[in-house]
Amino acid sequence: MRILDETTNKSVETLTLLLEKAEAIQLIGYLEQLIDIAPGTHHYHLNNDDYSKEITISLYDNSNLNCFSDRYKLLITKDE
């Protein structure tokens, strides 16, 4: 698992998500879709109602690192 704070561009150790039920249902749906396709080929953005908050989710493994930007490769390989 890798977590990036896009604002500070730093890896994050812990994260708390507080979701409304509709957001949790949407997140589950996105995760199910990601599991059904090849890792790294797609990602999803989960936003709140006014788009002021966003969670981006994607699947990765060692075979698909080339699908990611250099920043994400560093995060995935070194957790930096």
Predicted regions and their residues:
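Positively charged, low-complexity terminal tracts
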Residues: M1-E80
